[in-house]
């Protein structure tokens, strides 16, 4: 294999922001935010909106996140009423 063309592969902590579930895995993605893992080492943290801990397919039940959808956030940001408010 040619040297210098492949991204650097290292361990990172993936953090599900919905459930605060954390897991350590390998990735080419990196972050400036770090966290100490159970083994005492510091690893970069990648924040996730959804993971196997919070996705309904893997959990077998519906878990509704407290986060608003993109449209609701846009409407709230610009002070607009949503189409559901007219009913």
Swiss-Prot record:
Subunit comment: Part of the 50S ribosomal subunit.
Record has Transmembrane as a keyword: no
Transmembrane region(s): none
Family membership: Belongs to the bacterial ribosomal protein bL31 family. Type B subfamily.
Superkingdom of the organism of origin: Bacteria
Protein name listed in UniProt: Large ribosomal subunit protein bL31B
Pfam families tied to this protein: Ribosomal_L31 (PF01197)
One GO cellular component term: ribosome
Keyword Ribonucleoprotein carried by entry: yes
One GO MF term attached to the UniProt entry: structural constituent of ribosome
Sorted UniProt keywords: Ribonucleoprotein, Ribosomal protein
UniProt record, GO biological process: translation
Name of the gene encoding the protein in the UniProt record: rpmE2
Organism encoding this protein: Staphylococcus carnosus (strain TM300)
């Amino acid at each position: 294999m040619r040297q210098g063309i492949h991204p650097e592969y290292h361990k990172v902590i993936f953090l599900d922001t919905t459930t605060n579930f954390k897991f350590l895995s390998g990735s080419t993605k990196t972050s400036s935010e770090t966290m100490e893992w159970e083994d005492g080492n510091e690893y970069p943290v990648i924040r996730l909106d959804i993971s196997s801990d919070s996705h309904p397919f893997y959990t077998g039940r519906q878990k509704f996140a407290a986060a608003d959808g993109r449209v609701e956030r846009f409407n709230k940001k610009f002070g607009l009423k949503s189409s559901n408010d007219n009913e």
